[in-house]
Regions:
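Hydrophobic residues in beta-strands and at strand termini
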Residues: 58, 337-338
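C-terminal scaffold of the Radical SAM
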Residues: 2-11, 15-296
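A short, conserved structural fragment
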Residues: 308-318
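Short, amphipathic alpha-helical interaction segments positioned at domain boundaries
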Residues: 340-356
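Short amphipathic alpha-helical interaction segments
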Residues: 295-309
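Intrinsic disorder/low-complexity segments
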Residues: 66-71, 316-334
């Protein structure tokens, strides 16, 4: 991975790194020394702002075992990590077993107890729409997270991915399929309870207290350029998307031979529009009509009209200060989801896609 960082430094030669994210796989298995090695390579090959957001993804079962020495969180902090993303999913044994998670309720709570002693910037993942999860248990799940004092929650509806253990269980009648009506009820509870506890619903699946939004994911949602390092990692610029090969042995071999182990595709204007629409509609910032290519602007306004009439979307007029002049303001029209439309954001975006 250090070799890939070195080979790709020209891609961001004119950019400044603001966030670093250790995610995918099980990055929490990295030692303090391995994290330091990667961060050193980033600082040596790229321009990095002072105090960038550096997030590490971790699961409770990994952390609770390694935290027995009570040093793992201190080591992460010393290595440079300043934000933790912990895949709790649920604080209840029944849910964790049904989702085939490796950790249990006790480990989830122990992990957060230790983590909050060393980090104040922590996000937890929670899953809703789990069959047999009552509305009351979902409220309790959220309350436990609030009681731990976490400042950010990422929450997603349970989905059954093809060719997974859960998929097999559902097909064989061993596990009920998720119910969309229940998921919608849980989503409404999630929105209401997080708001009561001072969280801002700034992206469909993300809730943060002021100053604790995920800077890394926000950059992604706002269409900023990023590069992904390691097998299967994806990268994005406004006009291109690339992805690394998944096979570890082939990935290493290509780099040893001085080759970049990736494939790429050029994004058409339609692709760029659809990408912006999909991410923009999920956020509180919406889709700026000023940023939409002129050739697609009126088509978007026209095609969104039926969803506006149904109370799912709204176009708001906003005044923003000009970046080039403090005395000048720019008028903009911004397409956003309404409270009623939030749960349907992805479906609404796909209905508005431009397909050639």
């Amino acid at each position: 991975m250090v070799k890939e960082l070195e080979l790709r430094k020209e891609e961001l030669a004119n950019e400044t790194i603001e966030t670093i994210y250790f995610g995918g796989g099980t990055p929490s298995l990295l030692s303090k020394e391995e994290i330091e090695t990667l961060l050193k390579a980033i600082h040596q090959n790229y321009k990095v702002i002072e105090n960038p957001e550096i997030t590490l993804e971790a699961n409770p079962d990994d952390l609770s075992v390694r935290a027995q020495s009570r040093t793992i969180f201190e080591e992460y902090k010393l290595a440079g990590i300043n934000r933790l993303s912990i895949g709790v999913q649920s604080f209840f044994e029944e849910d964790l077993k049904s989702m085939n998670r490796a950790h249990n309720s006790k480990e989830a709570k122990e992990c957060l107890t230790m983590a909050t002693r060393h980090f104040d910037n922590i996000t937890v993942d929670l899953i809703y729409g789990v069959p047999n999860m009552s509305n009351e248990r979902w409220r309790e799940n959220l309350q436990i997270a609030f009681d731990f004092g976490v400042n950010h929650i990422s929450s997603y509806a349970l989905t059954v991915e093809p060719k997974t253990v859960l998929d097999s269980f559902v097909k064989n009648g061993k596990y009920p399929a998720p119910d969309e009506t229940e998921a919608k009820e849980h989503f409404d509870i999630l929105v209401a309870e997080t708001a009561k506890n001072g969280f801002v619903h700034y992206e469909i699946s993300n809730f943060g207290k002021p100053d604790y939004f995920s800077k890394h994911n926000t950059s992604y949602w706002l269409g900023k350029k990023y590069i992904g390092i390691g097998p299967s990692a994806h990268s994005f610029s406004k006009t291109h998307r690339s992805w690394n090969i998944a096979n570890n042995a082939k990935y290493i071999k290509e780099l040893q031979e001085g080759n970049l182990p990736n494939e790429s595709e050029e994004l058409t204007k339609e692709d760029q529009f659809n990408e912006y629409l999909m991410t923009g509609l999920r956020t509180i910032w919406g889709v700026s009509l000023n940023k939409v290519a002129e050739e697609f602007r009126e088509q978007l306004v026209t095609s969104s009209k039926k969803f506006i009439d149904e109370g799912l979307l709204i176009i708001k007029r906003e005044t923003k200060q000009s970046a080039s002049s403090l005395s000048r303001c720019n008028e903009d029209r911004v397409l956003k989801t309404t409270a009623k439309g939030k749960f349907l954001a992805d479906g609404l975006a796909s209905e508005l896609f431009i397909v050639k």
